Amino acid sequence: MWIDCEMTGLSLADDALIEIAVIVTDSQLHALDEGIDIIITPPEAAVEQMGDFVREMHTTSGLLEDLPHGTTLADAQAQVLEYIKRFVPEAGKAPLAGNSVGTDKSFLDRDMPELIGHLHYRIIDVSSIKELARRWYPRAYFNSPEKNGGHRALADIAESIDELRYYRSVLWPEDEGPSSAVAKEKAQLISASPTLAATSEAQDTTAKAQAAEDV
């Protein structure tokens, strides 16, 4: 369940949710529908306190001009839930997916708890994969597709799906992955040298070396 939100800023105390878009994909990242995009009219106070950077961003995208024609939070949540239930009627099945989606989820926790309650507690965050690629496979990271969503929710979430499609194509094999035997072997190697035990052993080695130098 791919979701992207636009807000008047990042403060849960002062800022408002002003746009939400949803695209549903299958497990192979094929979109099942063209998606839904809803504009939410925020309190005037949230618009007035908007910072210059965010105001310029939403002016350039056209979102600021569209805000007076939006709907309420309650209606937006009802529309999104109705849309999602067409594809995933049972609660707790579909994970929330997106890009740096923790920020979006914070606002949805506050403003659309019924929506969050319908989703699975696990999250698929493309930004996590991107950060791993930057460290482990920099060529894949630096050649990733350019993003031109323009800070509108539906375009941004479509680009997030495409971004994961790209990373899947370059970082994961097209077949079914390792055999069960290979996977079990790798798991045993990790279990034989867990992170904390390896750290403790390294510290012991360093301490012994330091003690030898002090003699």
Where in the sequence are the language-model features?
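Active-site-proximal helix-loop-helix substrate-binding element of RNase H-like nuclease domains
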Residues: P42-A45, D52-V54, V126-D162
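Acidic two-metal-ion nuclease catalytic site recognized across multiple nuclease folds
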Residues: K147, H151-V215
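Conserved non-catalytic scaffold segment of RNase H-like nuclease domains
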Residues: M1-I3, M7-G98, P145, L196, ...
